Structure formats: structure tokens, C-alpha cells
């Protein structure tokens, strides 16, 4: 059996919410893939005027994405730097804390229970694109190739960059740690160079966590939100295979102008991006997006 179904699963699971400062719609669709491996967080007011959103795109199984979805908020809020309002450092430390938890017996046991087997959980991983909104400050921490961008005055303002093995700095780290890049893949296998999980690439005790073949180290980008910022779109890589950011932005603007409905706009976006068939390979992945509109 190949990676694709004979017909796509186009049913969507969506959640919405709003408060005084923003409203959001989060939606996901399995699409052509045999399994659904994405997970996400959409959490208003984890404390007053602090909001948390995240996209986790799993590979090799859904268990690491589900684990991150379950534990990220709690671990972030327990973090001392978070409590001291050092949010950039807190986000980075929480990425590494999730990775550490995955390697502990209790974490491995939870992965196995999610997966339903006892021998392959360490092969799974996930991207992590996490947005923390604190008042008018937006922090986006990213490891992997999920993305976030703002609609800033009608133009996309990227809040993350993809971590790909062919990138010069990524390739240097991979090779220093004893790995190699072949056909744009780490050790000929993984098409991204930073992720949560993927524990088999993180076993060399000679190297720090940020120096391993695959690292959970996120880039953290910070910006001040203003009236120029209309919405933030977050998504797994499947959302960004077909259209560029400007095309996606224009589509969402048009839909919101017509419907004023975030959920309908997000769901219709996924329908537009879904491939008609699997011949080209693009538009065939699981798709998850979170659309956050600022009031």
C-alpha cells in the first residue's frame, strides 16, 4: 500500500474561539494521506492577555505530534523563564523539554500507547510552529517546515523559515554530528533538519541537543503587532505546497470580505489547495491551518 488513498478524505475538523482582542479558526483535513499525523493547539487566555497557538506536523506516525499537543502548554507555563516573562528563552527551553520528555521511560510509554505498538515510537517526529501572543507582542518559535506569516498591510510578513537539510548551516551541523545529506534528505531519509522526536538522530552523547543531526532548537522571531496586522496564518507544509504566501493571503482576504467567517475561509482554503489527484504529489498531504484575526 502506498502513502495515498484512492479518494481523499475531505471531512474537516474545526474549532473556533474569540475574545476581546482576536478570533481564530483552526481546521484540519486528512486529504489523500493514508493517516492523519497533524495536531495543533489553539488556546485563548492561557493567562490574561496571553494566547498560545501551535501546529505540529507528524512524520513516521502521529504520536510525537499528539504528545506535543498534550504537553506543550503545561511545560511552557511551568518554565521559570516563562514565569519571569522571558518568553523567547521559555519557548526554546520548552522545545527541548518536550524532546527530553520523549526520551524518558514515561514518555516512551505514552508514545507507544498512542501508537498502539511497543517497538517503533522512537522513529516518529514532528515539526513545531508555535505562536505566543503576549499583549501586542507576537513570538513565533519554529523547528521544521511548518510556517506562519502575518497579513501586514496586505503583504505576507514571514514569521518563520523552513529548516531544510540542504541549507548550508543545517548541512554543516548534520555533517559535524556524523550524518549526511542525500537528495535533500538527512541520511537519505528525513526531508527536514529540525524537529521534535526523531530520537534515533539524537543519541550521540558527545554533542549537545542543539548540535545533534536533528535538533529541536527553534528559531524564535518576535514582532510588535499594530493596526497594519490583519491576521496570522499558521499551517503545516501541506498548506504551502501549491500557492505562495501572497496567493494564500489574497484568497483569505477575498473570502473574509465575502463571508466574514473565519472557519469557512480556513476550510475553503484547504479545499482549494487539495490536489484533484495524486499524480504530481503536491496538494496531497495532511493539511492543518490556524487563522487568527486581530480585532
UniProtKB/Swiss-Prot annotation:
GO biological process: signal transduction
Record has Magnesium as a keyword: yes
Protein localization: Membrane
Catalytic activity: O-phospho-L-seryl-[protein] + H2O = L-seryl-[protein] + phosphate; O-phospho-L-threonyl-[protein] + H2O = L-threonyl-[protein] + phosphate
Entry keyword set: Hydrolase, Magnesium, Manganese, Membrane, Metal-binding, Protein phosphatase
Keyword field contains Magnesium: yes
Annotated EC: 3.1.3.16
Primary location class: membrane
Entry-linked Gene3D superfamilies: PPM-type phosphatase domain
PPM-type phosphatase domain residues: 23-294
Family: Belongs to the PP2C family.
Protein task: Enzyme with a broad specificity.
Name of the protein in its database record: Probable protein phosphatase 2C 6
Organism in which the protein naturally occurs: Paramecium tetraurelia
Amino acid at each position: 500500500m502506498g502513502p495515498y488513498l484512492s479518494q481523499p478524505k475531505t471531512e474537516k475538523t474545526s474549532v473556533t474561539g474569540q475574545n476581546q482582542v482576536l478570533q481564530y479558526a483552526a481546521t484540519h483535513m486528512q486529504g489523500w494521506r493514508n493517516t492523519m499525523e497533524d495536531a495543533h493547539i489553539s488556546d485563548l487566555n492561557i493567562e490574561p492577555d496571553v494566547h498560545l497557538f501551535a501546529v505540529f506536523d507528524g512524520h513516521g506516525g502521529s504520536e510525537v505530534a499528539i504528545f506535543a499537543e498534550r504537553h506543550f502548554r503545561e511545560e511552557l507555563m511551568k518554565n521559570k523563564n516563562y514565569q519571569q516573562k522571558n518568553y523567547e528563552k521559555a519557548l526554546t527551553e520548552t522545545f527541548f523539554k518536550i524532546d527530553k520528555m520523549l526520551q524518558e521511560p514515561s514518555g516512551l510509554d505514552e508514545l507507544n500507547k498512542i501508537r498502539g505498538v511497543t517497538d517503533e515510537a522512537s522513529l516518529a517526529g514532528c515539526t513545531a510552529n508555535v505562536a505566543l501572543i503576549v499583549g501586542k507582542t507576537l513570538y513565533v518559535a519554529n523547528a521544521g517546515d511548518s510556517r506562519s506569516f502575518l497579513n501586514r498591510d496586505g503583504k505576507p510578513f514571514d514569521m518563520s523559515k523552513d529548516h531544510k537539510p540542504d541549507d548550508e548551516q543545517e548541512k554543516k551541523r548534520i555533517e559535524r554530528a556524523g550524518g549526511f545529506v542525500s537528495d535533500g534528505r538527512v541520511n537519505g531519509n528525513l526531508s527536514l533538519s529540525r524537529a521534535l522526536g526523531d530520537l534515533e538522530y539524537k543519541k550521540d552523547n558527545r554533542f549537545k541537543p542543539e548540535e545533534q543531526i536533528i535538533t529541536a532548537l527553534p528559531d524564535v522571531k518576535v514582532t510588535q503587532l499594530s493596526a497594519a496586522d490583519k491576521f496570522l496564518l499558521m499551517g503545516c507544509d501541506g498548506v504551502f505546497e501549491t500557492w505562495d504566501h501572497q496567493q494564500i493571503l489574497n484568497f483569505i482576504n477575498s473570502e473574509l470580505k465575502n463571508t466574514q467567517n473565519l472557519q469557512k475561509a480556513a476550510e475553503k482554503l484547504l479545499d482549494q489547495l487539495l490536489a484533484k489527484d495524486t499524480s504530481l504529489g503536491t496538494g496531497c498531504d495532511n493539511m492543518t491551518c490556524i487563522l487568527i484575526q486581530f480585532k
